[in-house]
């Protein structure tokens, strides 16, 4: 359907043999997202960055065969994930909310920190997401709630998936917007008349943050690194005058504490280290002592 209406998506294929999988990866390159034909909450999914990881994961997942096909998708690094939550009636969008993930795409939407309204999306990105969402709603003749997840990188927009149901972010965007999306969706499904919300309601002078609650400290040998498997056990929603204010409220709400003396910085590669310099200087001005793993090893 997406090909027919001219909407882009990451390259993917349902494959039934190791030969087919290798041929597909030769075409798109690593990294790739590997998953069984149907998964829930990211279970049994994995991002493979090289041949060794691919073979190890496929042995754990299942035997690849015509009875057990594996879907392999191109994984786009350093892309932003954007969500469209909407209610449509007879294929026409009645109300919508576009939110952005703070983490790069690759973190399960149930674990990701989400901000609404979006604060760092290009105007053209938002415009294209609206247009594609209208196309999909019309093509599927949607009447009710739906959620579309997008990849956005340099105004290049790709559809990850479309779910014809209310998503976990529906209550969050409803509360931030003060528009009950579920009430609208219920009226649509019952065939009752629905009025489109006034566009002025979408002009907010505050920011909402949805953050996830984790239980890593209570689970022995739990991996705290977030990925495509959902690991959170709850979530909070907070509102602030800007992103920083709302994020701070959210982090405190899920149990993080503001450090008193030192801050450990785990910064990754050289570019990420350079990107962290300004934040480290700000922490230093506030009286904190930034510490790196290199510094810890030296002492």
Task: Give the role of each language-model region.
Residues 1, 5-6, 28-31, 40-42, ...:
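ATP-dependent carboxylate activation and anion-phosphoryl transfer catalytic cores
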Residues 291, 295-299:
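Residue-level detector of conserved catalytic or cofactor/ligand-binding positions
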